[in-house]
């Protein structure tokens, strides 16, 4: 169930939120990391850059431009509700627990996932 979208939510939020002055970069970080981590009971292991936290970091390239297309996304579907949307940024690097996982849109390390036990939600 659901719609494809998690792959592009950060770049959409940056393009149509931050770049258009609707939200700040700090708000974007809260929307995409801190608030979900608190909601799912994994904060402060996730959702913050601090000593003892996991160091999950996404670096955005604000100069990269692209167009969302079902032909190029990583979902196992043939459609995308954001088909044709223009993005004014791209994902440069993704670090999971401090390990480089994605570099310029390419997966460089597989199977970095780790089960995380949930606590009480904090939101």
List the predicted regions and their residue ranges.
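C-terminal cap of metal-dependent C-N hydrolases
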Residues: 51-116
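Short, solvent-exposed cationic patches
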Residues: 116-123
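Residue-level signal for well-ordered alpha-helical segments
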Residues: 5, 26-29, 36, 68-73, ...
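His/Asp/Glu-enriched, well-ordered alpha-helical/loop segment
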Residues: 1-63
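Generic alpha-helical secondary structure signal
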Residues: 18-20, 44, 79, 86, ...
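Short C-terminal domain-edge/linker segments immediately following a structured domain
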Residues: 7-15, 87-94, 123
């Amino acid at each position: 169930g659901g719609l494809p979208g998690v792959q592009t939510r950060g770049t959409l939020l940056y393009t149509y939120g931050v770049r258009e002055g609707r939200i700040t970069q700090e708000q974007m970080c809260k929307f995409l990391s801190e608030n979900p981590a608190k909601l799912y009971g994994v904060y402060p292991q996730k959702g913050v850059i601090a000593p003892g936290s996991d160091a999950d970091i996404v670096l955005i390239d604000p100069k990269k431009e692209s167009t969302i297309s079902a032909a190029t996304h990583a979902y196992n579907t043939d459609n995308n509700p954001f088909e044709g949307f223009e993005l004014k940024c791209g994902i440069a690097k993704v670090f999971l627990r401090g390990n480089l996982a994605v570099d310029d849109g390419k997966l460089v390390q597989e199977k970095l996932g780790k089960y995380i036990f949930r606590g009480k939600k904090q939101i």
